């Protein structure tokens, strides 16, 4: 070979080797998230921040929602049958599904019916050995009164289970697709309980999902590795990092510097500038969200509906929407967004009328300068900057004689304090989990949810509760619509919440990211993401 040809050949070999080395480098997706997870057992929590770090990357449920929709599709159950009376659900389980293998657990078997029974019976049976591993109970199961819905769960064989209900439950399949229905390993839980380390079920998670838990640095980041045995196929990325970044400005800065490839929920006012950046893409979703302020109806004088209506009429919602969201949200009038079944568009919002609000407060015997303790979280989510929203409420209510004291806490601390009922008012954004109105109503406003602490308004109206109970049990859509409209009318008169907005949701990503899709239920799925 002549020297020049040999040199050219050597250069080609080096170029090929370099290209192969680049392709072989592990691909890591870093996502800047809004808050730290409270734990890693989805049945114990209700926060989307927690589900982003637990249910979605680590677990699967029997059913799932089709990407970008609320349509229920098979997951760990490959198919099911429902009896004509709506009382018996028979699930055929997917075979060949493996649980995660880690340094702290090596499964000896594949997913089967025992795991389904364990995952649900621990929530339903107070005598179950794993029941008390969650000191605060199981908020979804408790608020939805799952014990009053499910008569029993039967193992037919290794790959079939049967749920027998006490009465028909219209959203039951959609409920099972929610994060609280994530399936855990009965084998792993049994080993932990036997060693007296049951708490590790919440800190060292084992699931069947697309990513395997690696480690958590509290309030900083969560790390995962791609699951090589994932039943849908190994994800295209090798590692996933959730970088906890409370400040939305910092999330955007980190995205621009390529420290994160996806930044969740940038501020609505930043969206236009982000769209002008040639390195970035902005994703938008008309999500199922109601941002609101829950009013504690067990605290005087807020136990009087006249006072709650006065608060509604004393708040300039139009100004709030412009300041916080620009044109990126519509006003909320009721408890759930217009896209859901039975939304009553005939109900008109309470008008902004400070003078009428003052008259109502006087009629109710409320003294001028009455204090109201408003609890908010740090950071910023789909409901905008909590501190800014709180300041607007504070300013408007001061004009009608209510002195708002703002108390700001880290997310988990605020959740704990408001479950205990410390607050007079709490800022919150509820994102629908299953595309059914019941998810907004029973969980957040039902009487049973007062006891579980999930009903932050601590409001129990028997007429409202009966309407949503009947709607939940009916498979007649027209009947459900009528009942939900009745419930909305009661809500509007009683005003346990100050409904604020139905915001659009935004995420931003770098141009080299593909395969990420937002969900109307705000479920973040990174298993399909590719980095170019």
Curated annotation (Swiss-Prot):
InterPro entries: Peptide/Ni-bd, SBP_5, SBP_5_dom
Gene3D superfamilies, A to Z: Dipeptide-binding Protein, Domain 1, Dipeptide-binding Protein, Domain 3, Periplasmic binding protein-like II
Signal sequence bounds: 1-24
Entry annotated with the keyword Disulfide bond: no
SUPFAM superfamilies from the UniProt entry: Periplasmic binding protein-like II (SSF53850)
Biological process, per Gene Ontology: dipeptide transport; protein transport
Gene Ontology CC annotations of this record: ATP-binding cassette (ABC) transporter complex; outer membrane-bounded periplasmic space
GO MF entries: peptide transmembrane transporter activity
Keywords, ordered alphabetically: Peptide transport, Protein transport, Signal, Transport
Keyword Nucleotidyltransferase: no
Quaternary data: The complex is composed of two ATP-binding proteins (DppD and DppF), two transmembrane proteins (DppB and DppC) and a solute-binding protein (DppA2). Five orthologous SBPs (DppA1-A5) are present in P.aeruginosa, which increases the substrate specificity of the DppBCDF transporter.
Record's function text: Part of the ABC transporter DppABCDF involved in the uptake of various di/tripeptides. Shows high flexibility on substrate recognition. Efficiently uses tripeptides.
Family affiliation: Belongs to the bacterial solute-binding protein 5 family.
Protein name: Di/tripeptide-binding protein 2
Name of the gene encoding the protein in the UniProt record: dppA2
């Amino acid at each position: 070979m002549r020297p020049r040809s040999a040199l050219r050949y050597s250069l080609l070999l080096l170029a090929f080797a370099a290209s192969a080395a680049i392709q072989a480098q592990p691909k890591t997706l870093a996502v800047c998230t809004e808050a730290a997870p409270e734990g890693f057992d989805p049945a114990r929590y209700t926060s989307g921040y927690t589900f982003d770090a637990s249910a979605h990357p680590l677990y699967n449920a029997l059913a799932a929602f089709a990407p970008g929709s609320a349509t229920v599709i098979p997951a760990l159950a490959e198919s099911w049958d429902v009896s004509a009376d709506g009382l018996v659900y028979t699930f055929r389980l997917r075979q060949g599904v493996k649980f995660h293998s880690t340094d702290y657990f090596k499964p000896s078997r594949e997913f089967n019916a025992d795991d389904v029974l364990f995952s649900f019976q621990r929530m339903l049976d107070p005598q179950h050995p794993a029941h008390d591993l969650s000191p605060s109970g199981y908020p979804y199961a408790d608020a939805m009164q799952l014990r009053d819905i499910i008569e029993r769960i039967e193992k037919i064989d290794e790959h079939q289970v049967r749920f027998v209900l006490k009465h028909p439950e219209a959203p039951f399949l959609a409920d099972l697709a929610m994060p609280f229905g994530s399936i855990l390993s009965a084998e792993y839980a049994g080993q932990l309980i036997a060693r007296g380390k049951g708490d590790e079920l919440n800190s060292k998670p084992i699931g069947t999902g697309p990513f395997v838990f690696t480690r958590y640095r509290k309030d900083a980041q969560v790390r995962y590795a791609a699951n090589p045995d994932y039943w849908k196929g190994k994800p295209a990325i090798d590692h996933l990092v959730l970088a906890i970044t409370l400040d939305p400005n910092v999330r955007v800065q980190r995205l621009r510097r390529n420290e994160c490839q996806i930044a969740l929920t940038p501020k609505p006012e930043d969206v236009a500038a982000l769209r002008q950046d040639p390195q970035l893409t902005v994703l938008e979703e008309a999500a199922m969200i109601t941002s609101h302020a829950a009013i504690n109806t067990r605290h005087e004088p807020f136990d009087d509906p006249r006072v709650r209506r006065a608060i509604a009429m004393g708040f300039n919602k139009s100004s709030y929407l412009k300041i916080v969201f620009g044109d990126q949200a519509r006003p909320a009038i009721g408890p759930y967004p217009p896209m859901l079944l039975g939304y009553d568009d005939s109900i008109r919002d309470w008008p902004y009328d400070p003078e009428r609000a003052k008259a109502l407060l006087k009629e109710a015997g409320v003294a001028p300068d009455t204090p109201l303790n408003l609890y908010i979280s740090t950071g910023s989510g789909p409901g905008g900057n909590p501190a800014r929203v709180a300041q607007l409420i504070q300013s408007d209510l001061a004009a009608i004689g209510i002195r708002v004291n703002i108390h700001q806490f880290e997310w988990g601390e605020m959740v704990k304090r408001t479950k205990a009922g410390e607050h007079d008012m709490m800022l919150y954004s509820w994102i629908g989990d299953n595309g059914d109105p019941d998810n907004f109503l029973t969980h957040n406003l039902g009487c049973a949810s007062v006891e579980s602490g999930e009903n932050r308004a601590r409001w129990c109206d028997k007429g409202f509760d009966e309407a949503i109970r009947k709607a939940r049990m009916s498979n007649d859509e027209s009947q459900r619509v009528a009942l939900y409209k009745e419930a909305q009318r009661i809500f509007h008169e009683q005003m346990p919440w100050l409904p604020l907005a139905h915001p659009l949701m935004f995420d931003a990503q770098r141009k080299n990211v593909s395969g990420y899709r937002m969900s109307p239920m705000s479920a973040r799925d990174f298993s399909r993401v590719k980095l170019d």
